[in-house]
Each structure stands twice: as structure tokens, then as C-alpha cells.
Regions:
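Conserved class I S-adenosyl-L-methionine
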Residues: 78-89, 97
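Conserved S-adenosyl-L-methionine
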Residues: 96-104
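A short glycine-rich, Lys/Arg-flanked "PGG" loop and its adjoining helix->strand segment in the class I
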Residues: 158-175
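Flexible, glycine-/basic-rich loop-and-beta segments that form/coincide
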Residues: 234-268
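Glycine-rich SAM-binding Motif I of class I
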Residues: 91-92, 113
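S-adenosyl-L-methionine
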Residues: 106-159
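A basic, amphipathic helix-loop patch mediating RNA/tRNA/ribosome contacts
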Residues: 1-48, 82-83
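Short, glycine-/aromatic-enriched active-site segment of Class I SAM-dependent methyltransferases
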Residues: 180-197
Length: 268
């Protein structure tokens, strides 16, 4: 009898849940009969030899590794802060915030039933399912927010930054994922939704950054996400700080250098 690789990992107690199993598999840490396997849906006989190598994923999903990089490289602190995790899904970002000392996290997502059970049970987490961030107002949260992460799909960041800015404290900060496949025009997105042209990456980062500046955010940092998105899409982390007025100063680093460094590292 054959079963999916993620199911086999759970059955053998090599992962706590199928979501965690998928994360470990996609991270390239699972070997079947000595060969690396990175597709959770591949089926194998239930007698096959499976080995998990490398570090155990410290969060409920691999998304936590993205925020972990931002916290480390951008000198972001969430210790003792009230946060929102916009596009929370399973809760990798929420988990990362809690493990870095966040006092409270509002996990906001348009979907339902996705947030990991461990986080649902945590009294520091407020689960806001079936909630469209575009219509969230400060009164819905009931308290000022110090920090927000954003990891949304099928929508541009230019549609969600302003409502989040409205509920942030005056010195509030954001770490958001820029996903070229959801920012570029349809004609610039290739097969399987992958954006391969460097010039398009430059364009979409610039578009998001200039928009953020125009509504009162200062760009503090931009770097690539350590983990690719579905189908191998390269994504970027942008670090923003709420500013009293529109910001016209230049970006910290020439965007072409950011994109060049990203492609040298990830486009293999």
C-alpha cells in the first residue's frame, strides 16, 4: 500500500502534523531510501525507509523562518509588544513572534480552520478567522498595535498597507513579504506563476516601496526571503516604520544591488 510522504511522516511520529511534515519536506530535510524528496504528495510504500536530517523546524510552519531572518538581520524587536500577523495561515509568523517575546498576537486571515491547534490554545493569541484585513479598523482590535507582519497571496501589498497603518502606533513597524507573482502584471508572470526576470523583480519592489513611502512609511530594510514560495518563486522582506508624513528620501540600498544579490544566492 502506498501513501503520501507527509502522511507517512506523521504516522511514524517524524512530524506532529501534516502541515509540519510538509514544511520539513519542502525545506529539503527528508530523505527516502537515501534520496532527498521535496514533494509532500509523492507516494511511497509504507515499508520505505524515511530519514529526517538537519535541524527540526522550530515553528508550526516554515513561514516562521522568514520572520526569523527579518528579526535577526533587520534588528527587529517584538519583545513585550502587541502584534498582528496578517495572512496568518498556519501561524508560522505568529509562532515566531511568540518565541521572540511578543505579549499578544492577533492572527488575521480570510480563511478558516488553518491556524495550528497549539496557537489556538495559547492565551496570547487572538484568532481572527474569516477576516479581510482591508476592512479591519482600530476598534476591531481594541488596542494600539506595535508591530505587524504581512504574508498575503493573490493581492498586492498596495491594497493592505493603508488599513494596517491606520491601526499601528505612531512608531509602529511592519515586516512584509513582497511576492512578485502577485505584484507584477499578468503578462510578466511566467509558467506556473513564476516571475523569472530580474527587471520585473526590481519593478515590483520599487512599486511597493514607493507606495509605502507615499502613505507615510519609511523604508528601513529590504532583503530576500530565505525560503522560496510555491513553485520556486523568490520573495522579498521589506521592513517599514510608520512616519508622520509621506517620505521622499531614497531607499537604503540601490534596488538593483538587492535583486542582483538575491539572484546570485537563490536563482539556481
Amino acid at each position: 500500500m502506498k501513501e503520501r510522504l507527509d502522511v507517512l511522516l506523521v504516522k511514524r511520529n517524524l512530524a506532529e502534523s501534516r502541515e509540519k511534515a510538509k514544511a520539513v519536506i519542502m525545506a529539503g530535510n527528508v530523505f527516502v531510501e537515501g534520496q532527498r524528496e521535496d514533494k509532500a504528495g509523492t507516494t511511497f510504500p509504507d515499508t520505505v525507509q524515511i530519514e529526517v536530517r538537519g535541524h527540526v523546524l522550530p515553528y508550526v510552519s516554515r513561514g516562521g523562518l522568514k520572520l526569523e531572518k527579518a528579526i535577526a538581520n533587520f534588528d527587529v524587536s517584538v519583545d513585550g509588544k502587541v502584534c498582528t500577523d496578517v495572512g496568518s495561515s498556519t501561524g508560522g509568523f505568529t509562532d515566531c513572534m511568540l518565541q521572540n517575546g511578543a505579549r499578544k498576537v492577533f492572527a488575521i486571515d480570510v480563511g478558516r480552520g488553518q491556524l495550528d491547534w497549539k496557537l489556538r490554545q495559547d492565551e496570547r493569541v487572538v484568532c481572527m478567522e474569516k477576516t479581510n484585513i482591508r476592512y479591519v479598523v482600530p476598534e476591531d482590535l481594541g488596542e494600539p498595535i506595535d508591530f505587524s507582519s504581512i504574508d498575503v497571496s493573490f493581492i498586492s501589498l498596495t491594497k493592505v498597507l493603508e488599513p494596517i497603518r491606520n491601526y499601528l502606533k505612531e512608531d509602529g513597524e511592519i515586516v512584509a513579504l513582497i511576492k512578485p507573482q502577485f505584484e507584477a502584471g499578468r503578462e510578466k508572470v511566467g509558467k506556473k506563476g513564476v516571475v523569472r526576470e530580474k527587471s520585473t523583480h526590481h519593478e515590483v519592489i520599487e512599486k511597493v516601496a514607493l507606495y509605502a513611502q507615499s502613505i507615510g512609511f519609511k523604508i528601513l530594510n529590504i532583503d530576500f526571503s530565505p525560503i522560496k514560495g510555491p513553485e520556486g518563486n523568490i520573495e522579498y522582506l521589506i521592513h517599514l516604520k510608520k512616519w508622520p508624513n509621506p517620505v521622499e528620501d531614497a531607499l537604503l540600498e540601490d534596488l538593483s544591488l538587492v535583486v542582483d544579490r538575491t539572484f546570485e544566492t537563490l536563482a539556481k
